[in-house]
UniProtKB/Swiss-Prot annotation:
SUBUNIT field: F-type ATPases have 2 components, F(1) - the catalytic core - and F(0) - the membrane proton channel. F(1) has five subunits: alpha(3), beta(3), gamma(1), delta(1), epsilon(1). F(0) has three main subunits: a(1), b(2) and c(10-14). The alpha and beta chains form an alternating ring which encloses part of the gamma chain. F(1) is attached to F(0) by a central stalk formed by the gamma and epsilon chains, while a peripheral stalk is formed by the delta and b chains.
Keyword list, A-Z: ATP synthesis, Cell membrane, CF(0), Hydrogen ion transport, Ion transport, Membrane, Transmembrane, Transmembrane helix, Transport
Gene (UniProt): atpF
Organism from which the protein derives: Streptomyces lividans
Name of the protein in question: ATP synthase subunit b
Bilayer topology annotation: Single-pass membrane protein
GO cellular component, one term: plasma membrane
Length: 181
């Protein structure tokens, strides 16, 4: 190495190592600033952090309470829904039973009307047949009597009275015979 470089190296100090008096002053300033921050700023920071922690814990408690209440409301809703379904089912069964009873009563009424109409028709047909039979029997009896006697029985009024009286006697005998059975 050249002697000049050696002299220059000795005269130059290392730029990375600060001088000792600056280092002491910087360290004292750091302790003062750190002490000030620890006394004034750190309690405020701790206070804000504590408030935040309490708010979070309170929010969690509120959320848990809300969740518990929501679960309770949900269970009440389910119970009410089940009760409403049960009531609806019972009401539908009652309405169905009522409808069936009404339909049976209506069917019974219609059946009785049909039977009554059938009996009335049979009675009317019986009367019509009896009337037609009475006329035919009257004609046959008159003709037969005319053939037996040998002369014509022309008096219709008298003839009708005799035939009606005879047939009424037959009806009375038939009615008493049926009543004694």
């Amino acid at each position: 190495m050249s002697p000049m470089l050696q002299i220059a190296a000795e005269e130059m100090e290392n730029p990375l190592i600060p001088p000792i008096p600056e280092l002491v002053i910087g360290l004292i300033a750091f302790v003062i600033v750190f002490g000030f921050l620890a006394k004034k700023l750190l309690p405020n920071i701790n206070k804000v952090l504590e408030e935040r922690r309490e708010a979070i814990e309170g929010g969690i408690e509120k959320a848990e309470a809300a969740q518990t209440e929501a679960q309770s409301v949900l269970e009440q809703y389910k119970a009410q829904l089940a009760e409403a379904r049960h009531e609806g089912r019972e009401e539908a069964q009652e309405q169905g039973a009522t409808l069936i009873a009404e339909m049976r009563a209506e069917g019974q009424r219609q059946r009785e009307e049909i039977i009554a109409a059938g009996h009335a028709q049979i009675q009317a047909d019986r009367k019509a047949a009896a009337s037609a039979l009475r006329q035919d029997v009257g004609k046959l009896a008159t003709e037969l009597a005319g053939k037996l006697v040998g002369e014509s029985l022309e008096d219709h009024a008298r003839q009708s009275r005799v035939i009606d009286r005879f047939l009424d006697e037959l009806d009375d005998k038939a009615t008493t015979a049926e009543a004694t059975r």
